[in-house]
Structure formats: C-alpha cells, structure tokens
Amino acid sequence: MKKVAIIGAGIVGATAAYYLSKESDLEVTVFDHGQGQATKAAAGIISPWFSKRRNKAWYKMARLGADFYVDLLADLEKSGQEIDFYQRSGVFLLKKDETKLEELYQLALQRREESPLIGQLGILDQASANELFPGLQGFDYLLYASGGARVDGQLLVTRLLEASQVKLVKEKVSLTPLSSGYQIGEEVFEQVILATGAWLGHLLEPLGYEVDVRPQKGQLRDYQLAQDMESYPVVMPEGEWDLIPFAGGKLSLGATHENDMGFDLTVDDTLLQQMEEAALTHYPTLAEAKSSGERVGIRAYTSDFSPFFGQVPGLRGVYAASGLGSSGLTTGPIIGYHLAQLVQDKKLTMDPLNYPIENYVKRVKSE
C-alpha cells in the first residue's frame, strides 16, 4: 500500500481525497486544521460564463470546472451519497449600466456552444424576473441563465469526506522531507498533496521556498426568511456582494473582499451592515429576515490572480495548488481531481503547463 497524505480538507483537498480513496492500492490520510477555510465561508455560485477576464487559461479552467460538477455529482451518486449541496436554479446578472447586458448576452450565446450547461439565456424585465424571484427590484432589466448553480461548500466537503471514508486528522502539521518520503505528524508518506489555500507558504517557507500567495478575507451573513427559496435563482449584482437563496428559507449575502487583513477571522459588523444596506435596495424583504449567523474565511490570491497546480519544484512526489481566489468553488473540484490524477500519474484534461506552479513557488535556499 502506498501512503498518501493530503494537507487541507477544503474543496481541493476533499475532492482529491474522494478520488484517491477509490484506489485500492493507496492509503489516504487527510490533515486539516479547520481554521478560516475559504470553502466553509464561500457564497458558492457556479456561473463563470459571463466573466470578461482576459486570462484564457483561467476561463478554460472555470468553464471546465463548472462542467466537472456533472461528473462529480454522478460519481457521488454512484457512491450512494446525497446530492444536497448543489442546485442548478439559474443565475441573475445585474449591471448598473444596463446597455452592457446585450453584449454579455451575446458573449454567453457564443460561449454556450462549448458550454451547453449555460442553458436558457434571456434578458428579462422586472415582471419576468419577479416570476422567478419575487420581490427583487432596483433594475429595469437583467440577464438570466438557467444553468447557473449554487453550491453549499461546507456540505460538499462533508459529503466528499463521508464518501471517501479516509482517515481525517484534525491538527496543524508541518512537512519534513526525509531521504525517502515525507514526515507529517508521526507518519511517513510517499506522496503528499498540499491543499492549504492561503496557508501554502506556512508549509513551504520553512523548507526554503518563496510562495507568491496572499490572503484575502471574506465575510458573509446568513439570514432566515419565512418563504422557501429553493427554486430562486442566485443574484449577482455589480460589486462584491451576491444573494444566494437556499431551500428552507435560508439566504446568504456576501462576500466581502478585504485585502491587507492577513489571516484575521473576526466578524466586522460594520462591513456586513454596509453590504446589507446595499442589498436592501434590490431586495427590501431582507429587512424582515432574521440573521442566523456570519461566516469568515480566507481566500488565496497570487499576484497576477491566476490559480496554479502541479508538482512542487524540487520536492518529488509533493503536489500543490493555490491561488483560486473567489472562484474556488468553481475551479476547486476539477483542480482536486487533477491533483489526484497527478499522484497516480494518470492522464489530465488540463495541462499544468498552463497553470505553472514554478511561477509562484520558488526555492530560494536549500535547507
């Protein structure tokens, strides 16, 4: 049995654990500290098709990441897992300058040829939008795609770990290279996946690496409403907050994008209040909702906002990914799957050369 360790049980680590657990010749152990994980505090909208980012490699990963959910859902269903973390209920895109909607509509039509998952597309007026999301206002027109989905990140990770039945060790660990293998805690592993998001530098800097990954704080607030919102589309206005409705009257509002806060996990009521006030202009019903709690997580960004994955330069059998930013629930599962493929030396659909780890993880001194 080959021993494989995964450090970090967010969306990337949990997906890798799930796919590796299917291999009978591997013994997989997951280590997770459990503090500040971005996945648990993620708003969770899967709708990359309206992005105007010029980074073609990023868009390809995000597009394939949205498509990959279809495979992941099918695989989990075969494993006998509940698919209660994902719902394709559509997405509403709002723009302050509504003349831009036509251009985005045309872009999405063109992209639908390679991404049929986008589903039905249309520019809706307020009356039509209110048939799908009663009470939404503050716009004349919006763009709708029926294929937009929402994901409960924390629940997805729970389901992946349940299905994988791997050993989960809840502690903060470090990585020590030995002449053969790597020591983590009390054990030695032949291969290691580092899926610690913004904390990647904490593992690699002691080994003489420079890691171009910075933390960004995100906060969101959950509300409870009287009406069931299971079939409501997610709402993406211009700006940093989104409205994400769930079954059972749960509604999430978020998330903030706070730079220069390091790994701070305190709730900032002022920022959450500002977000709520901005959201009230679009959804006044929010004033009647009860706040049911806040979530805070730390996203990982590289200096050029690109994600990366691959083998850590100079550490044979150690693979890492980071820099997923605010699209981690879209790109996380497909990256986790690819890390699992790399461990097994299997075929990849995305070429790591387009997401080169050596641009972001550099050895500056040998131990």
State each model region's role.
Residues 2-28:
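N-terminal Rossmann-like FAD-binding beta1-loop-alpha1 element of flavoenzymes
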Residues 5-7, 188-199, 336:
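Short hydrophobic core segments
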Residues 15-22, 33, 44, 84-85, ...:
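Active-site substrate-recognition segment that forms the wall
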Residues 45-128, 278:
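Dinucleotide-binding Rossmann-like beta1-alpha1 core, especially the glycine-rich loop
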Residues 60-64, 96-101, 143-159, 266-270, ...:
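Short beta-strand to alpha-helix junction loop
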Residues 82-95, 110-111, 117-159, 256-260, ...:
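Helix-loop-beta segment of a Rossmann-like dinucleotide-binding subdomain
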Residues 149, 167-183:
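A conserved short coil-to-beta-strand element within the FAD-binding core of flavoproteins
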Residues 289-367:
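C-terminal catalytic lobe of FAD-dependent flavoproteins
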